[in-house]
Amino acid sequence: MAKKFQITLAQLNPTVGDLEGNYKVALEAWERAKKVGSDLIAFTELFITGYNTQDLIKKPSFFKAAQDQILQLAKACRKGPAIAIGGPAYIEDKLYNAYYILADGNIANVIMKHHLPNQNVFDEKRIFDEGEISGPYQIGPIRIGSPICEDAWHSDVSE
């Protein structure tokens, strides 16, 4: 087992709808994490799109552009720390609030948010589909779990 595993937490302030700007912020943060020897940099929920996108995420052109930014980030950051970053996922005609694990120039794993809030300013049940509970993923020798926001408050999501 590794003697150390360094994680950089990138609790930044993405701008809703500014995919290119959020990509640039993520890339700059990744470069800083690489300089300090991190093994993983973790961004927030829906970082690439900003949170909360409301109906903007349902526009096919916006969703495709968000996916393109995630793929571009994976390729640009293939030599250095892995990336955990929030973004939308569209699988089998369902739209998910997802968390992408990027490593070695590829999407290594995708975690879907399971518990969707639906109170006060949160309207996720109208926008997203509920994902299956995802288990941990592997970064080098380490198994990591990344519950997405509300998921962290429910014991059924953790292993």
Predicted regions and their residues:
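Enzyme catalytic cores with a strong preference for nitrogen-chemistry domains
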Residues: 1-159
